């Protein structure tokens, strides 16, 4: 149940605004001591070294536990990347980890643009599946039709 979670907004933990036409769902911001993902950190560092070579020198900073459990829950096209004057932490690499089995939900597929609007990849994620991608890539979760989709998103980058 999402009763202890907040409504999913847009922004970071400090400045989050609700736009239900863009995003609906529930979330909980976690701190590093809440999750011990040293193996995930190591995996992300290896993927970054091999494929992206982005500045993630300060490691994992933000953790977001998200539940889509209402038939209209979704997150429209967006980027996780913010590098304006107001942010302390610059997100460079994102990982989305699915915590639901594929039988637990219908809809809520993960879409990501691979460089341009013409090359969109779609993933029906199941428990344990994960996607690592540059935070500047546009992506979305389409509308949940039924069930419950749970994910953990972790952002890696650096402090300004």
Q: Can you describe what each PLM-predicted range is?
A:
Residues 61, 75, 91-93:
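Hydrophobic core residues within well-ordered beta-strands of beta-rich domains
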Residues 74-82:
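Histidine-centered catalytic micro-motifs
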Residues 67-69, 81-83, 97-101, 114-116, ...:
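Short, flexible loop/turn elements at secondary-structure junctions
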């Amino acid at each position: 149940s999402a009763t202890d979670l907040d409504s999913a907004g847009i922004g970071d933990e400090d400045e989050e605004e609700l736009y239900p036409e863009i995003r609906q769902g529930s979330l909980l911001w976690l701190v590093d001591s809440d999750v011990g993902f040293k193996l995930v950190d190591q995996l992300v560092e290896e993927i970054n070294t091999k494929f992206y070579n982005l500045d993630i020198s300060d490691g994992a900073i933000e953790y977001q536990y998200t539940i889509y459990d209402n038939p209209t829950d979704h997150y429209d096209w967006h980027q996780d990347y913010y590098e304006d004057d107001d942010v302390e932490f610059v997100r460079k690499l994102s990982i989305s980890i699915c915590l639901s089995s594929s039988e637990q939900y219908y809809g809520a597929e993960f879409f990501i643009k691979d460089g341009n609007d013409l090359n969109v990849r779609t993933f029906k994620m199941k428990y344990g599946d994960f996607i690592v991608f540059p935070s500047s890539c546009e992506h979305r979760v389409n509308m949940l039709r039924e069930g419950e989709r749970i994910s953990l998103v972790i952002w890696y980058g650096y402090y300004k």
